[in-house]
């Protein structure tokens, strides 16, 4: 079998971190004996510059046919038209592929807790996953309007939309430490009242999982004061967007956090959670670990290569533990150095 992968380098540092990761994929495929083909497409701001829109039909159709999609990063101050922004291409891609699940792991690597802005004893051993609903909620709700005197956004969820994301979270928790924290604002929001009701109903199907409910403001506090208490966190779109960014700084850098977005069938999208960092684009100083860890998720989930994913992750964790990092993590290596060291380790 030959896996079909669509590569979307995007903007800013996206091309350099994605292209380097693809060089690692070539080494890994030879080592673990599997076949793939890459289809490159412009996306985001780069696509606006070339085609006048952030996501063309050609790119969208290629993504629909793919086994996996690897995305570098999109956006930047260059693209200011509110009706034609790079981010709108990503929203359209998520909606078109029905990517209703977003998975964001946060892991504090052994020996690297000193990198965190929080006290070492508070974060050491943190290993949590945020499961965010990605295609409903206030980002997609109708009606919405804006004028100089009034603006309206609508936060809507159906039972079916809540059930499908909650089932994903319960299954993930059952495969890990068996703890699920459901986050809502049930004390004031009607949508959260339905959310909590559905979570409690679905929990009856997963007796092996312990469920805890937290209001979103309390959860944001506990993520800082005691992140080690969490295993799997599930939440709606807006809450997940905010909490996952908060959690991502716990290990010490946005550059350490991968993510995956998927539906019940079809291709999965893998990307680091950081932005395009146009201020350092082309300077060979970008931290590529988030992109490489996203590749590891792709190897495990879409390419059926769990051993390869494990090896890649262990090499990364070892490098971080021994200070072989870029400047944002206190190291002295550049982007190329990271890829060269990983290439040597994989070829060993």
Curated annotation (Swiss-Prot):
The reaction(s) this protein catalyses: (2R,3S)-3-isopropylmalate + NAD(+) = 4-methyl-2-oxopentanoate + CO2 + NADH
GO cellular component assignments: cytosol
Tree of life domain: Bacteria
Cofactor binding mode and count: Binds 1 Mg(2+) or Mn(2+) ion per subunit.
Gene3D superfamilies: Isopropylmalate Dehydrogenase
Site, Important for catalysis: residue positions: 139, 185
Membrane-spanning intervals of the chain: none
Main location: cytoplasm
Residue sites binding NAD(+) per the record: 76-87, 275-287
EC number: 1.1.1.85
PROSITE patterns from the UniProt entry: IDH_IMDH
Cofactor(s) needed for function: Mg(2+); Mn(2+)
Family: Belongs to the isocitrate and isopropylmalate dehydrogenases family. LeuB type 1 subfamily.
Function, as annotated: Catalyzes the oxidation of 3-carboxy-2-hydroxy-4-methylpentanoate (3-isopropylmalate) to 3-carboxy-4-methyl-2-oxopentanoate. The product decarboxylates to 4-methyl-2 oxopentanoate.
Protein name, UniProt field: 3-isopropylmalate dehydrogenase
